[in-house]
Amino acid sequence: MKLVNASDYNLPSRVILRAVDENHIAIVKLIKSRIIQKDAAKIVEIARQIQSVDADMKVSLVCSSAICSKSLTLLKNEGIGVIIEEL
């Protein structure tokens, strides 16, 4: 997967984006700690920002397996797919 420049979507440079496919981008959060609902809410805001620039863009999250069930539910309800990768 190719890295995408976050500034193209008016996002801070610390946000890591990867192109998964044409019209499909992934937000990368490979951290050791668990992703909680507060983190998921921030991911939803990033996804909305990406889709405000390119409405046809599908957004997914690339993360480790440490993600809480409430976060998974929130992401699923917002149409954000989850791709599990190991650290």
Explain the meaning of each model-derived region.
Residues 1-20, 38-39:
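Active-site metal-binding core of divalent-cation-utilizing nuclease and nuclease-like domains
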Residues 41-49:
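Histidine-anchored nucleotide/phosphate-binding helix
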Residues 11-21, 27, 77-85:
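Generic preference for hydrophobic/aromatic residues in regular secondary structure cores
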Residues 57-87:
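Short, compact, well-ordered microdomains
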Residues 23-26, 55-61:
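Hydrophobic beta-strand segments of well-ordered beta-sheets in folded domains
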Residues 23-42:
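Glycine-rich phosphate-binding "P-loop"
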Residues 48-56:
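Arginine/glycine-rich "motif VI" loop of SF2 helicases in the C-terminal RecA-like domain
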